[in-house]
Amino acid sequence: MGRVSDARARLMEAMSELIWTGSYGATTIDQICDKAGVKKGSFYYFFESKVELAVAALGEQWELRRPELDAIFSPTVPPLERLRKYCDFGYRFQAELRQKHGCVLGCPLFSVGAEVCTCEDHRLGQKIQEILEYKRRYLETAIRDAHAAGLASAPDPATKSRILFAYYQGLQTQARIQNNLDVLKDAIVGTYDLLGVKTVEPATV
């Protein structure tokens, strides 16, 4: 076993990768410990259960991704460009994951969220919903600004953001099911169509 000081971080990293490349339900504590190089006793020193570890791991991953999304959706960036950058980021990120793991992984929040939504222990589902709501708000702000600037037709940005987020969720899920990055290439085309944007530029990815 490595140093106890980094065992918690290695457990979270192992959990994130295992549930992303596989599934939450199929991932066992033994598998997590093996991948992290941590003994089971150390697992229970840091976490009382697999659920607690998963909540911590997804929260940690979100905090690592958040600065990049903050930059993409900065109010200093024109609203339609924010949406384009978001679509481009999603494609590039999935391409990097495919290069590393050999397949398109999609978004773990969507796949794990669907998997645990009927579980009696709601902690993981609640954490996923919390993170997804943060992501949706990025879209809502960009949509509101685009409408205010006369660039889009979205008088109800909250509703429009939920529709657009569901569209992205569908694309990510289909890309994983089909193991096909091309599903994500025209995300901006559908985005502009849903928002009533008149001009759609070719995808940059």
Describe the function of each predicted region.
Residues 1-6, 201-205:
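N-terminal intrinsically disordered/low-complexity leader segments
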Residues 56, 70-105, 158-164, 205:
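Hydrophobic alpha-helical connector segments
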Residues 93-97, 118-120, 145, 164-182, ...:
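Amphipathic C-terminal alpha-helical segment
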Residues 10, 18-60:
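Helix-turn-helix
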